């Protein structure tokens, strides 16, 4: 069991590292999934921090669960309704769309 956990950890680390390097290229191709004006210092900062969390965080494989969410909700609804209500309440559109766009990219890479 321990060996399996280590293997999963290494796999998740590799995926996170790979995705972090590829994330901007992939997201630029699907940026139309979010509202206009999704770029900005706040959004870019969250974008980068989230990528780092994937590498060093203990639960970097939770995207497999989010992949099922995508099957239930279209990406357009993610931007209009919001996947994360607490971000919508803060009314930070840049962060909101960047975070969701990042997740969409991750799902495309899995």
UniProtKB/Swiss-Prot annotation:
The topology of this chain with respect to the membrane is: Multi-pass membrane protein
Q: Which domain of life is it from?
A: Eukaryota
Protein keywords:
Membrane, Transmembrane, Transmembrane helix
One GO cellular component assignment for this chain's record is: membrane
Q: Where in the cell is it found?
A: Membrane
- Residues that span the membrane, as ranges: 6-26, 38-58
Q: Does the keyword Transmembrane helix apply?
A: yes
Q: What is its main location?
A: membrane
Q: What is the name of the protein in this document?
A: Uncharacterized protein YBR027C
